[in-house]
Curated annotation (Swiss-Prot):
Domain of life: Eukaryota
Gene: BOT2
Binding site for (2E,6E)-farnesyl diphosphate: 373-374
Organism the protein comes from: Botryotinia fuckeliana (Noble rot fungus)
Source lineage: Eukaryota, Fungi, Dikarya, Ascomycota, Pezizomycotina
Entry's induction text: The botrydial biosynthesis cluster genes are co-regulated by the Ca(2+)/calcineurin signal transduction pathway, which is under the control of the alpha subunit BCG1 of a heterotrimeric G protein. Expression of the cluster is also positively regulated by the cluster-specific transcription factor BOT6.
Name of this chain's protein: Presilphiperfolan-8-beta-ol synthase
Amino acid sequence: MAIPALEPQLHDADTSSNNMSSNSTDSGYDTNSTTPLEKSEKPNTQELKQQQLDPKRPPFVRVPDLFGSIMSTKPVVNPNYFAAKARGDRWIARVMNFNKAVAARNSKVDLCFLASMWAPDAPEDRLVMMLDWNHWVFLFDDQFDEGHLKEDPAAAAEEVKQTIAIMGGNAPRYTAESNPIRYVFQQCWDRLKAVSSQEMQQRWIDQHKRYFDQLLVQVDQQVGGENFTRDVEAYMDLRRGTIGVYPAISLSEYGAGVNVPQHVYDHPSLQECMKVSADLVTLVNDVLSYRKDLELGVDHNLMSLLMQRDNLSAQQAVDVIGDMVNECYRRWYLALAELPSYGEKIDYNVMKFVEICRAVAQGNLYWSFQTGRYLGPEGHEVHETGIMYLPPAANLVVA
């Protein structure tokens, strides 16, 4: 699953609030402004011997340049970041009844940083709703990823049914006490519905159903032990749905006040931009999470799939993913080349929508490095050197 469980991430996250710059300047957000972190410990003799014994998993891999092409610009952070973060973090802590320690860890995860890059021009109230949705999707997703719904198809389907009912107006009014996760989603839906057109509301519903449908497929595959019985394209098809990018794009449309007519939204070029965004998030996550997945014994990862299915080394698998990232860039520009003009007013919104697709992928990339989501305090060095050290085999959890 692409979206990590909240609790494990809370322990590993690091704050990024000291490195913010708003869109009041032209510099945006600069990762190079951070103080270089202490260098990672170099592989010792035992680790080098491990490479000789297990050449498929060396002590380190060289990651591809994930900051190239459409990811090379410096993202802009919404100037309402600090106010929205304070409001949203307090609210979710109260709703979920977090104790002080969990609330502090949640604050360090800094989902507002992520939302602020997705919609740098969003007003404060809309940015707060985007943060609330991000909190919801992590909590909701965790139930299917590592929680009680992971291997319970009937219960998973019921949870999805009840969540869809919220958007259909057929659900009871939830409270923080009766069902906090559904309550958060219901509050987000209420706020979007109050200011959005029927077309935008339907788009929100459709993209969430798309996400939910693939979560249920994931649960079925988990129960059936099908993690490595599909090819790369089948894996990517599933992950495009479960990654959460499609509803995140709809969320960012709301935040930015974008209004693309449905017949334009349905054009293959815009659909391909959404698909590229989802693929970039998936590929970045699977490379950067590989070390943590090894430590936790998790194998739902493209790296592991490539290594097992095609008998590749870790480095060869990374290189394949690097080629897939470059192919995403090519697909992006080909899609834009086929995009027709609809006139000034519509084209303005189309270009804003295209930028949202790009910003969702780029925001995930910068957030993943900056907050210690996967790499802990080594994110800056991995970005600078391209070297990601892997844990010794003796430290691994047997899945």
